[in-house]
Amino acid sequence: MDAGKGEYQIAKSDEEWRRELTPEQYGVLRQAGTEQPWTGELLDESRAGVYACAACGAELFRSGTKFDSGCGWPSFYESVRPEAVELLEDTRLGITRTEVRCANCGSHLGHVFPDGFRTPTGDRYCMNSISLDFQPEDE
């Protein structure tokens, strides 16, 4: 995975990440893969709560900012704090996109698109379910 800002609060070796994550999680979180649309466990999650990084547990999104974008991945219009995520230019597919990573550990979460959807920010954070852990508010 390409380096982002270089230093993260949670810094582990590739070997440590491989031991701690499932192969599917590793492929998305550490190798910037993408899960298939409409397959993620959190796509239809509607309870109140917080979405945290599946790799390090850092809080990333709140359920109040989640919306149905119809794209097949969980979508949010903003992160819990601007500094909770890291935004990087991604040109891997021959187009320019903005990659979203966890600012705490550098794990790949998905991409953000400024395509409106009549949200308060106009942004659509299109996240991989496998990159997130949902923590219900009532637990």
From Swiss-Prot:
Q: What's the Enzyme Commission number for this chain? A: 1.8.4.12
From its record, what is one biological process in GO terms? Answer: protein repair
Q: Which residues cross the membrane?
A: none
GO terms assigned for molecular function? peptide-methionine (R)-S-oxide reductase activity; zinc ion binding
Q: Which GO terms describe its cellular component?
A: cytoplasm
Positions with a binding annotation for Zn(2+): C53, C56, C102, C105
The answer to whether the entry has keyword Oxidoreductase is yes
Q: Which cofactor does it need?
A: Zn(2+)
Q: Which UniProt keywords apply?
A: Metal-binding, Oxidoreductase, Zinc
Catalytic residues, per the record, are C126
**InterPro entries, per database record:** Met_Sox_Rdtase_MsrB, Met_Sox_Rdtase_MsrB_dom, Mss4-like_sf
A Pfam family of this chain: SelR
Tagged with keyword Metal-binding: yes
Question: Catalyzes what?
Answer: L-methionyl-[protein] + [thioredoxin]-disulfide + H2O = L-methionyl-(R)-S-oxide-[protein] + [thioredoxin]-dithiol
EC class (word) = oxidoreductase
Explain how, and how many, cofactor molecules are bound: Binds 1 zinc ion per subunit. The zinc ion is important for the structural integrity of the protein.
MsrB domain span: 14-137
Q: PANTHER family of this UniProt entry?
A: METHIONINE SULFOXIDE REDUCTASE, METHIONINE-R-SULFOXIDE REDUCTASE B1
HAMAP family in the record, alphabetically?
MsrB
Query: Which family, according to the similarity comment?
Result: Belongs to the MsrB Met sulfoxide reductase family.
- Name listed for the protein in its UniProt record: Peptide methionine sulfoxide reductase MsrB
Instruction: Tell me the organism.
Output: Leifsonia xyli subsp. xyli (strain CTCB07)
Tell me the name of the encoding gene.
msrB
